[in-house]
Amino acid sequence: EMSRGLGDVYKRQVWCGDGNEYGQVQGLPAVYKGCAPLLEHALSLNKTGLESRIHSGLICTGDRFITNRTELDAIKRCFPAGLAVDMESAAIAQTCYLYGVPFLSFRIISDTPGVEDHSSQYADFWGTMAERSFLTTWTFLSTLPDNL
């Protein structure tokens, strides 16, 4: 089963001085909220029979690829609600926030650092998930209501 995480985004491993939450850039939100109507629509796809399951939760964004359980555990200590870790979502969320554009981040969970066969989990991902990812994204976009 492929999991897709989407929803709120929080930067991690950035300290921007006193008066800011860990990961918060001065003058900007600590957490970028996903657009509620887009999130609701995305979650409704779970009822369509898609092969992929969609989950909503916090995405922790950083500046490196996480390859081991120690790094993942450190992130989870800072952000216990974290569903996924990536390197892109916060930058996209911040840009959308600054320009007033509705935001939602679809993330495919490609691997879980620290589990047995982590490397093959990641390698197998590229051969099996492209089509399913496209189908999920296409279904999401093609079924968006006109009023969004």
Question: How does the language model describe each region?
Answer:
Residues 1-10:
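Single conserved hydrophobic/aromatic residue that forms the stacking wall/gate
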Residues 33, 37, 70, 87-90, ...:
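Conserved active-site and cofactor/substrate-binding residues in soluble primary-metabolism enzymes
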Residues 113-148:
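His/Asp/Glu-rich mid-to-C-terminal helical/loop segments that flank catalytic regions of hydrolases
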Residues 15-84, 99:
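Active-site rim beta-loop-alpha module in soluble metabolic enzymes
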Residues 92-124:
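Zn-dependent metallopeptidase/amidohydrolase metal-coordination segment
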Residues 2, 87-89, 112:
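Generic detector of well-ordered alpha-helical packing
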Residues 43, 90-93, 97, 134-138:
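Predominant activation on well-ordered alpha-helical scaffold segments within soluble catalytic domains
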